[in-house]
Amino acid sequence: MSDDKPFLCTAPGCGQRFTNEDHLAVHKHKHEMTLKFGPARNDSVIVADQTPTPTRFLKNCEEVGLFNELASPFENEFKKASEDDIKKMPLDLSPLATPIIRNKIEEPSVVETTHQDSPLPHPESTTNDEKEVSLQQTAQPTSTIVRPASLQVPNVLLTSSDSSVIIQQAIPSPTSSTVITQAPSSNRPIVPVPGPFPLLLHLPNGQTMPVAIPASITNSNVHVPAAVPLVRPVTMVPSIPGIPGPSSPQPVQSEAKLRLKAALTQQHPQVTNGDTAKGHPSGLVRTQSEEPRPQSLQQPATSTTETPASPAQPTQQTPNTGGRRRRAANEDPDEKRRKFLERNRAAASRCRQKRKVWVQSLEKKAEDLSSLNGQLQNEVTLLRNEVAQLKQLLLAHKDCPVTAMQKKSGYHTADKDDSSEDISVPSSPHTEAIQHSSVSTSNGVSSTSKAEAVATSVLTQLADQSSEPGLPQVGVVPPSQAQPSGS
């Protein structure tokens, strides 16, 4: 047995032997490809049936973290973390550029968010009594609450030794997002650092997508009053359904980002009352939609920050319309085949109907022709019978002197151009019968009527001869017979 299969598998617990090395290599490859999942969790319920179903396979892949190791363009900047860690992951804000903090009382100012001429609807949203940006004119530190338009990022707590920013997660519907800027009473200039600030975006469908927010500040000499923890949510209707990113280092548009933008484009934001906060002296938050330029968040007396709008926003309607065109063009194959078969059946039905009408017309025409043919055959048969009867009648009266006299007088006068033999010498009765037969058959119906007239006249003459016996003997005697009698 060992001589027939000399190649032994060296895997632990497997003692199979194979005839050649190729089979052994394939067998070893199966050992290498065997999936080895980690131990089951202690809190999971033990199920007796351990059949590897697709659901269990996906669950095991999630447990071992197979789906979290997908390649992304930001894998050098971020590390692998779970969803709970993403929501609570602290990031250091020390390299970020923040406004200069000074212990100075400032007057209330207006926070205005503009972004130029967008093809999307132009919602204007203002805050109400509870959603104001209030600045206190006291020596106590105050805080400024600013929410950029449609900034949709996960709940990330960003802390540093001097300031902290809390950005709440925004869902596709317009919700409140609060940015709390807290600063101590010390004055400290912060130098802006070039480059985008990375964040992890948690999409509503459960995926995680990294984004970059620019950290440049246009005005470094702005003043922010000393802050006291004052948190009031500012609700603004998003005018740009995208995530602002840097103008030059724009990341590659991934499929998840395009899906997110399409979902946000379909979302129709509700416009809140825009006249409630115009009379308040503390501040006014407005959102204007104009031409797609870099979106700037302007706070004249507090801070100034520019966040360029996403360049892919003005063309968001094009992929949707193209998708609708593709869906219209690419119909269901079953529906297309059903319509094709229906058209074929209708065409075949029309063809069968036309053929049926044509065949019926041919049958009717054939019946008419057959009936006409039968009538003609009957007429021909009757005519033949009549001709035969007339022939018999002529043969019966071939020796009649009246017939001979009528022939001499009638046929002689009618046929003057005939030979002299016919005029001088009377023809034989057989020849006369043949001539009568040929005339009657050639002339058809007219010859038949003529023969009837001749027969009628002959019968009349015979009747006259029977009533006057002396006359026919004298008048009917041929000259050949009269000469010998005279001699």
UniProtKB/Swiss-Prot annotation:
Main location: nucleus
Biased composition (Polar residues): 425-436, 457-468
Region of interest called Leucine-zipper, as start-end residue ranges on this chain: 362-390
InterPro entries per UniProt: bZIP (IPR004827), bZIP_sf (IPR046347), bZIP_transcription_factors (IPR051027), TF_CRE-BP1-typ (IPR016378), Znf_C2H2_sf (IPR036236), Znf_C2H2_type (IPR013087)
Entry keyword set: Activator, Cytoplasm, DNA damage, DNA-binding, Membrane, Metal-binding, Mitochondrion, Mitochondrion outer membrane, Nucleus, Transcription, Transcription regulation, Zinc, Zinc-finger
Source superkingdom: Eukaryota
GO CC, one annotated term: mitochondrial outer membrane
Entries under CDD domains matching the protein: bZIP_ATF2 (cd14687), GCN4_cent (cd12192)
GO BP term (any one): regulation of transcription by RNA polymerase II
C2H2-type zinc-finger residues: 7-31
The bZIP domain, residue ranges: 334-397
SUPFAM superfamilies, per the entry: beta-beta-alpha zinc fingers, Leucine zipper domain
Region (Basic motif) residue spans: 336-356
Gene Ontology molecular function: cAMP response element binding; DNA-binding transcription factor activity, RNA polymerase II-specific; zinc ion binding
Assembly with partners or alone: Binds DNA as a dimer and can form a homodimer in the absence of DNA. Can form a heterodimer with JUN. Heterodimerization is essential for its transcriptional activity.
Protein name in UniProt: Cyclic AMP-dependent transcription factor ATF-2
Gene responsible for this protein: ATF2
